[in-house]
Design a protein with these regions (language model features):
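Structural and coupling elements of P-loop NTPases
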Residues: 1-731
């Protein structure tokens, strides 16, 4: 594994369609923004012969960062597939954004992959978000390896970074996180930094020198061997500890020299099972070089150590009616089950869907059943519809190469599935099936928007609908209380990209306006009101008088209407008219224009005219009576309160609780969870947590998560209510 003498780059270069699941590896790259994932993909593509030269992120020339937004921001904002071929194996490299706002793209990559490469910068280390993703992979048993990048940095220390990785990723078993290679350093520069020029293979005791631009293998000198023996022995012990051969440890402890072939085979099996996590090193190719440092070794690990799709547990599948269905593992001849990992709208070819096939074989012009269930609350309506597949293609960044088929275990792009959304299931039209939906984080940053002009209004709805269909981490809300269009996002960068795509893809200019919460009004004490609507200036007139009493009710009671009229002062047929007028006025509000709630309105008395009284007249009188009752009453402004649950590392619990208190929150309690984390439960006014998604990330260095849910409305403090009223008056 990476210790072979063969240095020949994959002759096939760019991969096309696979013919058997055993010849496919689906690998997602995970790491924080700036860790070097995109640069590593570029180096692997160069070594595999898929590109003639490696592009640079700074120049906008990389294969996987091809979007204009990515070029401007110089960071990935979307999932990108770069398939390459090495030693007859098709490797689907899934490059994901490292910034937390684009975790939906990461989730899509994890769903499509069978193994993960965690990319760690030698100069920056492991951040909390990367640890959290590691734990998620561990929970589902996904095989993982670690690649240390930025070895060219002046302060890069591979051995120290290996120790940090073992501490961060190997809490349960640090001896399962060990390097397979050590960096080979060139002559020391005047500044004291010795650049990395190659690698030393621990198992093979071979040197792999990349100084010439291509990998050259040699034997170390006798004086160099002692420097690697300690690391080699620890690696051997780590491999043996994870071996399924229970006699191997006894033989090793008994003094037997275990042959390298046996060790490599056991290492490969342990990696594929997800019980051993090798650490490798990589650096981009120098100008004019054909191979980056460590790229051959990494490609060897992927092809020989990472599992095939045949080794992945079959996904949970049901009929569209919810009946469980058992599938054979990744059978190209089985019933079609594929998942839309990602959708995107192209201005020239329409909607394009990246699909992972889990069973069966997908072909162009095939009619499939598209099922989408489970995200109705985010604007994704349930749908079951038959559609014809357009062209199939293998993406290579923004380029597409036509395919004749896509078998179980492989990925492809599908054109012209107009109804398919991210997370949907594709199956045979005569045997519709549904995959269990994947979990996505809740979008918790509200972005209130409105069309910039009349011309933009017609396009806004369509543009927003398409954005939400592509990205299930967005949620579209038409707030009936505030009459605002709200796009819920994961963070500010997520929101910025959404606005840019509205403009560039759909030609929609929008204005961002302050987000409002749904306030309510209520009476603080009992009050009475008289509504008089009399117009009798000749001809058919209008006459209605009613007297009401309004009293407060407990929160959540709504509007209660009671008739206590005696003696027919208000004719029976007009009492519903009074109630209708009262409820209509309550919906408009009686003080600041917010709906009135939680009151009992009692109709006490009134007067009518045999000719001039009417339904409309008593509706008007009812509304006037409620408004008069409000003029002499104390009206409380009610604000929505949210139940907030924050899962945070123990070291940040104090800061989180203090911050919640500063937002007028009430901490209800804490609960210790696994992994040194605490669940903090609180109730906080919604008006105080509009930007909490951004603020919490800063407070916890990206390691905390939170959930919010509406609890109730309750009276707003007088000084806050006055500030809100003043803001509303100022526009």
């Amino acid at each position: 594994m990476g210790d072979k003498a063969n240095t020949h780059p994959g002759a096939a270069g760019r991969a096309t369609a696979a013919d058997h699941p055993a010849s496919v590896r689906n690998v997602v790259l995970v790491g924080h923004s700036g860790s070097g994932k995109t640069t590593l993909v570029e180096a692997l593509a160069l070594t595999a012969g898929a590109v003639n030269r490696a592009g640079r992120v700074e120049d906008g020339g990389t294969v996987s960062d091809y979007d204009d937004i990515e070029h401007r921001q110089q960071r990935s904002v979307q999932l990108s597939l770069v398939p390459v071929e090495w030693d007859g194996i098709k490797i689907n490299l899934l490059d994901t954004p490292g910034y937390a706002d684009f975790v939906g793209e990461l989730r899509a990559g994890l769903r499509a992959a069978d193994a993960a490469l965690f990319v760690v910068s030698a100069s920056d280390g492991v951040d909390g978000s990367t640890r959290m993703v590691w734990d998620e992979c561990a929970a589902v048993g996904m095989p993982r390896a670690i690649v240390v990048t930025h070895l060219e940095a002046a302060r890069a220390d591979f051995e120290e970074m290996t120790r940090i990785c073992a501490e961060a990723f190997g809490a349960d078993d640090p001896d399962a996180v060990l390097p397979l290679y050590l960096p080979l350093h060139g002559p020391q520069a005047p500044d004291g930094h010795a650049p990395v020029t190659g690698l030393t293979g621990l198992l093979s005791r071979k040197l792999f020198d990349y100084a010439s631009g291509e990998r050259k293998e040699s034997d170390p000198g006798e004086d160099e061997l002692p420097g690697i023996e300690e690391a080699r022995n620890r690696l051997i012990e780590g491999i043996i500890a994870e071996s399924e051969d229970e006699t191997l440890m006894d033989r090793y402890l008994g003094g037997e020299q275990i042959d390298v072939k046996t060790l490599i085979e056991d290492l490969e099996r342990a990696v594929a099972r997800g019980t051993f996590f090798p650490v490798l090193a990589a650096a981009p190719a120098a100008e004019g070089a054909r191979q980056g440092i460590g790229t051959v070794e990494l490609l060897e690990l992927v092809t020989r150590g990472f599992p095939t799709p045949l080794e992945r547990e079959a996904p949970r599948v049901t009929t569209v009616d919810g009946e469980p269905r058992t599938l054979d593992l990744c059978d190209p001849d089985g019933p079609l089950v594929a998942e839309v990992v990602k959708t995107a709208s192209d201005p020239y070819v329409g909607r394009v869907s990246l699909v992972r096939v889990f069973s069966g074989t997908l072909r162009p012009d095939q009619t499939v059943h598209v099922s989408g269930h489970g995200l109705t609350d985010r604007g994704h309506e349930d749908h079951d519809v038959d559609e014809r597949v357009g062209a199939l293609s293998a993406p290579f960044g923004k380029q597409q190469r036509a395919l004749t088929h896509c078998i179980a275990g492989d990925l492809a792009c599908v054109a012209k599935l107009s109804r398919a959304e991210t997370g949907d299931t594709l199956s045979a039209k005569d045997d519709p099936l549904l995959m269990e939906p994947w979990q996505m984080p809740d979008p918790l940053l509200p972005l209130a928007i409105q069309a910039h002009s009349k011309a933009d209004e017609d396009k806004l709805s369509q543009g927003l609908s398409r954005l939400v269909a592509e990205d299930p981490t967005m949620r579209l809300e038409q707030n009936q209380g505030t009459h605002q269009v709200v796009l819920w996002c994961l963070g500010e960068a997520h929101a910025d990209v959404a606005l840019e795509r509205l403009r560039s893809r759909y030609g929609v200019q929008v204005d961002v306006v302050p987000h409002k919460v749904s306030l309510r009004e209520t009476f603080a004490a009992r009050s009475t009101g008289r509504g008089r609507h009399v117009k009798q200036s000749g001809g058919h007139g209008q006459f209605a008088i009613c007297e009401i009493e309004v009293e407060p009710l407990p929160g959540g009671s709504g509007i209660e209407f009671v008739d206590k009229v005696v003696g027919g002062a208000v004719p029976r047929q007009f009492i519903p008219s009074v109630e209708k007028g009262v409820r209509a006025q309550a919906a408009k509000g009686v003080a600041a224009g917010h709906p009135l709630v939680d009151v009992r309105v009692t109709l006490l008395d009134g007067k009518a005219h045999s000719v001039d009284s009417s339904d409309a007249a008593f509706q008007t009188a009812g509304a006037l009576a409620l408004r008069e009752a409000a003029t002499d009453a104390r009206i409380h402004l009610l604000e929505p309160v949210a139940e907030v649950s924050v899962l945070v590392g123990d070291e940040y619990v104090g800061a989180v609780m203090s911050d919640l208190s500063g937002r007028r929150g009430r901490v209800l309690g804490t609960e210790q969870t696994s992994g040194g984390r605490t669940l903090v439960r609180a109730e906080v006014p919604e008006i105080e947590i509009g930007r909490y998604a951004v603020d919490l990330r800063s407070l916890s260095h990206g390691t905390a998560r939170f959930h919010r849910a509406y609890a109730r409305h309750e009276p707003m403090p007088a000084q806050v209510a006055e500030r809100i009223r003043q803001q509303e008056q100022d526009g």
